[in-house]
Amino acid sequence: MTTKKSAEKKLVSIKKSPKSLGKPMKGRDILVKALVNEGVTVIFGYPGGASMEIHQGLTLAPKIRMVLPRHEQGGSFAAGGYARATGEVGVCLATSGPGATNLITGIIDAKMDSIPIIAITGQVPSTVLGSDAFQETDIMGATFPLVKHSYMIQNVAEIPRIIHEAFHIARTGRPGPVLVDVPKNIQQQEGIADFDVSFDVPSYRPNLKPSILQCKKAAHTIQAAKRPIIYAGGG
């Protein structure tokens, strides 16, 4: 005999286990799988306390090669160089605080030169954000004018969507850097994530059609120039 209580329990179980969901995973492993799904094969990362869980997850991902720079800034520039050389999105990884701020020069370079990179930073646990915790830095605020977009992951279930969005934003329109900040407790937290994600970013609609007026003006300027020089590649 099926009671109302057991029927409700069964219904909840069905709702929590659609076909696109798998077994519970740590946030770090969900993040790594999301990166693999985006085709990432190389990450340039310098480990630290707030990002160590992600590094542990990467040891279980044979498809991703981990390159250890001597300094986080070198990692961000290496990610940019990798993107230039391969046409793929470069990925760099650093811990919180000084590790994250050391990425900034490479992030600025990517913004100025229209290079698609994803900068992933470890962060102090979300439960102590704003308490001046050890090596806590508002890296989202520090890089706000330097990136196309930035995220702080607050729930393991949203990791696949955020990573998918970050790569889409980095590589489309005028390419550029995107920051993904991941608190340590989110890296450690277990949850069930849906990797069959779709997204819609209403505020992000890059205009890929050139202005006819601007094209005519450029053509007239080139035609009238005696010694024209074209400097191309600014995105």
Across the structure, where does each feature detected by a protein language model lie?
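N-terminal alpha/beta PP-like core and its mobile active-site loop of ThDP/TPP-dependent enzymes
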Residues: 2-235
